[in-house]
Structure formats: C-alpha cells, structure tokens
C-alpha cells in the first residue's frame, strides 16, 4: 500500500516538475531577447566607463610627464643641479 502511495506521489511530482519546466522554458524564450538586449546595454555602459577611466589616467600621466620634461629642459638650460628643483 505504501509503495502505491509513493509511486503516485512520485508520478505527481514528475508531472508537476515537467509542467514547471515547460512554463520556465516558455518564460525564458519570451524573455531572452530582452535579457540579451539588457546585457549588451550594461556591457557597453561598463566598457564606456572603463574606457573613460583609462583615458583619464593616460591624460594625467601624459600631463605629468610633460611637466617633468619641461622641468628637466629648464634645468638643463640653466645648468643647475637637479636637487634644487626636487620637492622633498
């Protein structure tokens, strides 16, 4: 008798899980294009933010390097020691 109850429960559970699986597949196929579009939008935004941060770092580095080159040229022209121009 218990075997019959368990087999009925198991059959009901299998049927229920198959129904849920079909519902999830239908839901996912309807949602897929929107999710894909959202993923690409988020990816493009993140890549844009990353590109802006890299550009800012490169600009700061170039700006700092140009200032350093100008200082070195000025020091060489005046033929003074570099120690006087260094900040401690």
Curated annotation (Swiss-Prot):
Parts of the chain that traverse the membrane: 38-58
The keyword Membrane is annotated on this UniProt entry: yes
Keywords: Membrane, Transmembrane, Transmembrane helix
Subcellular location: Membrane
Record's bilayer topology term: Single-pass membrane protein
GO cellular component: membrane
The protein, known as: Protein alpha-1
Species per Swiss-Prot/TrEMBL record: Bovine ephemeral fever virus (strain BB7721) (BEFV)
Gene that encodes the chain: alpha
């Amino acid at each position: 008798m218990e075997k019959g109850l368990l087999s009925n429960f198991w059959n009901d559970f299998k049927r229920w899980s198959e129904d849920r699986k079909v519902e999830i597949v239908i839901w996912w196929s309807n949602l897929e294009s929107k999710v894909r579009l959202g993923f690409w939008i988020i990816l493009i935004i993140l890549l844009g933010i990353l590109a802006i941060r890299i550009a800012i770092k490169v600009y700061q580095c170039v700006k700092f390097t140009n200032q350093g080159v100008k200082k070195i040229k000025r020091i060489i022209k005046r033929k003074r020691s570099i120690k006087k121009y260094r900040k401690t």
